[in-house]
Amino acid sequence: MTLGSLGNSSSSVSATFLLSGIPGLERMHIWISIPLCFMYLVSIPGNCTILFIIKTERSLHEPMYLFLSMLALIDLGLSLCTLPTVLGIFWVGAREISHDACFAQLFFIHCFSFLESSVLLSMAFDRFVAICHPLHYVSILTNTVIGRIGLVSLGRSVALIFPLPFMLKRFPYCGSPVLSHSYCLHQEVMKLACADMKANSIYGMFVIVSTVGIDSLLILFSYALILRTVLSIASRAERFKALNTCVSHICAVLLFYTPMIGLSVIHRFGKQAPHLVQVVMGFMYLLFPPVMNPIVYSVKTKQIRDRVTHAFCY
């Protein structure tokens, strides 16, 4: 029996959801699992390597790298959140997930996602202080301040996402139990509820605007100030050097915000977009940043690059 027929025949309230993986490509799941597995093999060891190098290399105990360690922790968390259901579906066809497990996964995925947005904003502030106020860099970004920034970021993410599982749990799910994805997302679960989801939709939009919306605008504002300062530097070599310190962060910002904003726009306004596009965008927004961030920072950061090269060559 296929997922579609199972979903159509389900007229009673189900205690579980069924994750479909990539709809329409079920026969190719075993082959799709190969690049997905490779991505996890890059993401998890890659972020663990970043954390280990920053912890053991005393020269990296600076604000920029402390924020990078936060980013690596979040990327590690995102990878581990999706790993069980993704590999379960593509390897052994384990598609069932209980409502409570789905809501828990949903909470952690969204919490880590919005926490990553906060840390990327913090890293933009770090670059702003380093370039625009270099003489006050150490006095402004002390370890205490960095710790408080991390706690505030965590508190904001948890506070905003905590209501979502309870808002979803109060609804009946009496139609098809099939979630057209490989993991649980708020927008996907809402589609299965047999109730008016207007309040959930409004709250979801509020969360996105108050996190990703505000953070992305503040990052743009930070880089506008950075660019103004850089253009006022007389030496061309110094201008290039200053901008070069921002390249890794700009790559991380683009890797995170581009698919996330695209996915949010498609979910809310692109009703005619093929569902496969939504699924692919969902994979990009959750899997690409954890895979690419360690690579980008390893390539662009000499201390990290040297340690990684030394570990593999000796």
Curated annotation (Swiss-Prot):
Membrane topology value: Multi-pass membrane protein
Cytoplasmic topology ranges: 52-59, 126-144, 223-242, 300-314
Matches recorded under Gene3D superfamilies: Rhodopsin 7-helix transmembrane proteins (1.20.1070.10)
Extracellular face residues: 1-30, 81-104, 166-201, 264-278
The entry's keywords: Cell membrane, Disulfide bond, G-protein coupled receptor, Glycoprotein, Membrane, Olfaction, Receptor, Sensory transduction, Transducer, Transmembrane, Transmembrane helix
Annotated CDD domains: 7tmA_OR51-like
Transmembrane segments: 31-51, 60-80, 105-125, 145-165, 202-222, 243-263, 279-299
Keyword Cell membrane appears in the UniProt entry: yes
Sugar-modified residues: N8
Claim: Glycosyltransferase is one of the keywords in the record: no
Name this polypeptide is given: Olfactory receptor 51G2
Lineage: Eukaryota, Metazoa, Chordata, Craniata, Vertebrata
Gene: OR51G2
